[in-house]
């Protein structure tokens, strides 16, 4: 995927609101 950190909020140590 292009944004593996935007698929689910709070999915890791990078909580990005």
Swiss-Prot record:
Lineage top rank: taxon: Eukaryota
GO molecular function, one term: serine-type endopeptidase inhibitor activity
Protein's UniProt keywords contain Disulfide bond: yes
Gene Ontology terms: biological process: defense response to Gram-negative bacterium; defense response to Gram-positive bacterium; negative regulation of cell population proliferation; negative regulation of translation
RNA-binding among keywords: no
Keywords recorded for this protein, A-Z: Antibiotic, Antimicrobial, Cleavage on pair of basic residues, Disulfide bond, Protein synthesis inhibitor
Role noted for this protein: Inhibits cell-free protein synthesis. Inhibits trypsin and chymotrypsin. Does not inhibit ribonuclease of protease activity. Has antibacterial activity against Gram-negative bacterium P.fluorescens, and the Gram-positive bacteria B.subtilis, B.cereus, B.megaterium and M.phlei. No antibacterial activity against the Gram-positive bacterium S.aureus or the Gram-negative bacteria E.coli, E.aerogenes, P.aeruginosa and P.vulgaris. Inhibits the proliferation of leukemia cells in vitro.
Similarity comment: family membership: Belongs to the 2S seed storage albumins family.
Subunit structure: The mature protein consists of a small and a large chain linked by disulfide bonds.
Name this polypeptide is given: Napin-like polypeptide
Organism: Brassica oleracea var. alboglabra (Chinese kale)
